[in-house]
Amino acid sequence: MHLSVIIVNYNVKHFLEQCLFSVQKACLGIDAEIIVVDNNSTDGSRAFLEPAFPAVRFIWNSSNDGFAKANNQGLAQAKGEYILFLNPDTILSEDSIENCLSFFKQHKEAGALGIKMIDGSGKFLKESKRAFPSPLTSLFKLSGLAVLFPRSKIFARYHMGHLSENENHEVDVLAGAFMMIPKKVLTEIGNFDEHFFMYGEDVDLSYRIQKAGYKNYYFAKSPIIHFKGESTKRGSLNYVRLFYKAMNLFVKKHYRGSRAGIFILLIQLAIYIRAGFTATGNLLKKIGLPVLDAVLILTSFWIIKILWSTYIRQQTNYSPHILYTAFPVFTAIFLIAAFYSGLYDKGYKQSQLIRSSFIAALMLLSVYALLPEAVRFSRGILIFGILLSFVLMNIMRQLFISWHYLETRNENDERRQTIVVACEKDFAAITQLMKQAGMPERVLGRVENGATTSASALGHIAHLPNLIKKYTVKEIIFCENSLSYKEIINSIAGTKAVVRNKFHASGSSSIVGSDSKNNSGDYVAATKMYNIAKPINRRNKRLIDVALAIIFIIGFPVFIFLQKRPARFYKNVFEVLAGRKTWVGYATEINDLPSIKKPVISSTALPIKLNELPAESLLKSDEWYATGYSAITDLKKIIKGFKYLYY
């Protein structure tokens, strides 16, 4: 056998589906096998993939022991003369594999071959070619000098910026996303080092290949797409921890003496600096807008109070103690109302601000009405303060949108801003797929790729840039059939317009894409839309969990007599309060539903241990619960199963 393709999968079944379609095409005419090692995915990968790809050999692990170990599992069963280690979130050109194999025939000294990679938006991924880490390269990267001098042989050495991305080069490090190696080389140097859990294994293997006297090459002729659909996001603290831990391990393994000591010190420093920036950035993303809103709301109340006492109620003296307490409390209530109304969900819509302000007004006026007469100040200040808050928050958001600091979502615009590059048959399949996925109608029309342009098409792909401008297109779905993978990749690499690109293999059941290398990819699939997956419902579910837990704690003298085993009941209360459990959840542990915490009682209103229905019926109960979820659903089931809350 000439080639073995080894792919490690973890919870990216839709990306892997598209990847396998492209790999199968790239392997046509080659004596090849495809091996997929699944690291205990929980997204239903087995049921989804195994029937769809009977020619692929699957290895299903019962635990996730890391990327390196999974690759070694596949390698142990591989029969090919050459081994291609490939990430599941990639799409290959039809000639990628053939061209790489030809390169090895022409370069007997080659020990490994990487390839030019672009992200879903068509941008070159710099990790396609790298140098080995060293104190100086790390310092230049950390200090930002590599960004200031991206083509410098000295400052940009980490990503070898001085080497053209469009030419073949001898390099140090190849990316594990696409790494082709002769099996005889692996037999000589050994397999992946399993001490590297998720990152660094490609650096270590590249180092050992070079140390054995072989050369590592970067191949620019047949670019591939790498979506970055992995579960550990680059912007997370977990990514920082895993990445720099891997670099630390690499240095300790391969470097010696004072050089190693300096480098390890630099890595430790980098961990703290990067973690600090990451934590600060994540914190600002989460609380930045609410904090600014709090300032605007508080300011609005004080402005209205000053105007009110100056022009409306000149003779009224408002107690500073009341105002210093009331205004911050009312601001907090406003923010809570805004949060649970979805104002801080991804993709801002003005309707969210209107709804949030209206709900906040109702809550504030209700709270104000319950206050004793002695501590009330003025309903007018409250009402006009809310109105001014709305105006200022709206102005701030419009400014942020114009400065591109705030992502906006306009459903009316999105409905007609997607075009599909496909033949008529595939276009019908894609529109049906989007309909089944429960997405709003947003397809503007079809773009032709044939010799002639039919009357039903908006235009020809040769005029794609003009079509993007004419129809203000925000998203393009490329279908592999009327276009080859190579044509699709070349098309997105050559498109300068800022659009979202998505990809669909003819006959597949999903559409995948990613806007940038820093974001995990997204997908459209013919799956049910679950209410329980919506951010607003997840917040409401957590609110019910916490509210009931607090009620049970406050009502301790009563509830202690209403439960058969009060100690176990209150153990559940505190676990729910801590976020380790939820009052109501699924009756089945293995399903393809949105994840929620371990439940006290299940969707049948019984504890999991007491469910006697067949597994199929329990799964159906869970699907109904997830699909039709509302806050009332949980309350009804808790009332029904109240006597079992001690389980």
Predicted regions and their residues:
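Short aromatic/hydrophobic "clamp" motif used to bind/position activated sugar donors
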Residues: 83
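Short, flexible, basic/aromatic active-site loop/helix in glycosyltransferases
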Residues: 115, 132-171, 528-538, 546-549
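Active-site-adjacent helix/loop segment of glycosyltransferases
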Residues: 207-280
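N-terminal hydrophobic signal-anchor/signal peptide
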Residues: 271-310, 336, 343-350, 356, ...
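Glycine-rich, basic loop-to-helix element that forms the pyrophosphate-binding segment
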Residues: 60-78, 99, 462
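Conserved donor NDP-sugar-binding/catalytic core segment of glycosyltransferases
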Residues: 91-127
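Short, acidic, metal-binding catalytic loop of nucleotide-sugar glycosyltransferases
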Residues: 21-31
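A conserved acidic beta->alpha catalytic loop
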Residues: 22, 38-47, 63
